[in-house]
Amino acid sequence: MALNLSHQLGVLAGTPIKSGEMTDSSLLSISPPSARMMTPKAMNRNYKAHGTDPSPPMSPILGATRADLSVACKAFAVENGIGTIEEQRTYREGGIGGKKEGGGGVPVFVMMPLDSVTMGNTVNRRKAMKASLQALKSAGVEGIMIDVWWGLVEKESPGTYNWGGYNELLELAKKLGLKVQAVMSFHQCGGNVGDSVTIPLPQWVVEEVDKDPDLAYTDQWGRRNHEYISLGADTLPVLKGRTPVQCYADFMRAFRDNFKHLLGETIVEIQVGMGPAGELRYPSYPEQEGTWKFPGIGAFQCYDKYSLSSLKAAAETYGKPEWGSTGPTDAGHYNNWPEDTQFFKKEGGGWNSEYGDFFLSWYSQMLLDHGERILSSAKSIFENMGVKISVKIAGIHWHYGTRSHAPELTAGYYNTRFRDGYLPIAQMLARHNAIFNFTCIEMRDHEQPQDALCAPEKLVNQVALATLAAEVPLAGENALPRYDDYAHEQILKASALNLDQNNEGEPREMCAFTYLRMNPELFQADNWGKFVAFVKKMGEGRDSHRCREEVEREAEHFVHVTQPLVQEAAVALTH
């Protein structure tokens, strides 16, 4: 799951991809910029490519992230004299994403610890897990989010799946009446903010990457990133005779077959991992070994031989074969800022030239095609199983106020001052009835470094408008752990989706919010009281007229009554 400072992605708006089987030619269909339409509202349409064509590129400047969830929102009871609250909340299947009848509130899920299942395929800290889940249930949360790690389940050999600890953990959730968002985590754990443990890719996959290093994402300096298999190899039988996409599909099919009895009742959502930190993006800002530090612009990740082969073919199809040998090498280094570089600078930057449009269109379309392939498999595998499919998009809010939006571009989201990079993603998800899950919901613009022109609130607003236009449900997560009322208030505000363009005032809220994360800090008395009040307020929805003080008084009484249970959870997790 996404743990980074906050990531989001975007993509290009090229020719729509037909759902179903992808072909090699679909990777190469890049039309000249004049043949593509500009994006929807809120974006400047006076686009003109100008400035010098950076071809040949300059040398780099070195510098210092249900078909129907009908049961996803059941009633919960608060015992010990506090009364019972009945709320029926459901994910919306289609239409205007997240729209509900009468503003019925936003269900809250809580992310489980990354190491909830051990490397030995058992439940980690079993006693702590049970006490913690009981506490969460008593607080009124809808359910939990669990990483189902590829590197744990299919660790030993291809096609051999050990569901060990997951069987026990999911049965415990069922027993307690908690719903589950299961994340198909095809990435490595370790190397991102908040990654407290290391869970590598399956050993047999690592062996194949060792034999063929080009299976790893690669930057222009030859640095390899092993968090996730390069999308350039998606359709090649490079993993013991199977393609990466086939491996992901086989894993999801095995999960479905093993947990069929829980799908639709306990397991209500399948979040499909599509990149580093489980997000649909390139690993453009890797934090391992200090390669990238916030708020650097990151670097393009398309220099493995498979991606370069696709770029070469795309350039030939476009009629500019000289553009096919490399990506822009004047785009700076990981920790540069946009104005440090020729490619991303405001005036005359290569991003705003014909070459820049060609490259960024190809780069972002490769990411869209990757998502389309995996979603097509997921949709067919989980069809009629009563679960909703979701995809996580990173909240990349730094340098959002610049013209080029450099960090979004290197991550694969073709989002600039003149182009909406999130609508194409939303449209792709809409074709598969999937949920658009977005991070950095808790952040406010003024909390972030203003010299880096960070704007998480404006970014969330843009994404909300894109999902509204595409009629796709929007869900949210906080990017960093927060326990304060100020962050909770921002989440409440963002989840209400109060947009000026909101279809004549029709009620629309996020379909769900997932809170990062369950840990000892959450169960500290002060934090727990604020969290309980937050969950209550989220459940009441936008139409609630109760003041926060009233909700907090209820929460205080609740915390007092359930104190022994919460203390047990805190102590057990600490040890």
Swiss-Prot record:
InterPro entries: Glyco_hydro_14, Glyco_hydro_14_CS, Glyco_hydro_14B_pln, Glycoside_hydrolase_SF. It is an enzyme of class 3 (hydrolase). Disruption phenotype: Normal growth rate and starch breakdown in leaves during the night. It catalyses: Hydrolysis of (1->4)-alpha-D-glucosidic linkages in polysaccharides so as to remove successive maltose units from the non-reducing ends of the chains. Changing residue 189 to S: Normal redox inactivation under oxidizing conditions. This is Beta-amylase 1, chloroplastic. Changing residue 440 to S: Normal redox inactivation under oxidizing conditions. GO terms for cellular component: chloroplast. The keyword Glycoprotein does not apply. Redox regulation; active in reducing conditions, inactive in oxidizing conditions. Thioredoxins f1, m1, and y1 mediate the reversible reductive activation of oxidized BAM1. It comes from Arabidopsis thaliana (Mouse-ear cress). PANTHER family: BETA-AMYLASE 1, CHLOROPLASTIC (PTHR31352:SF31). The active site is at 279 (proton donor), 477 (proton acceptor). Expressed in leaves, roots, flowers, pollen, and seeds. Its EC number is 3.2.1.2. Keywords: Carbohydrate metabolism, Chloroplast, Disulfide bond, Glycosidase, Hydrolase, Phosphoprotein, Plastid, Polysaccharide degradation, Transit peptide. GO terms for biological process: response to water deprivation; starch catabolic process.
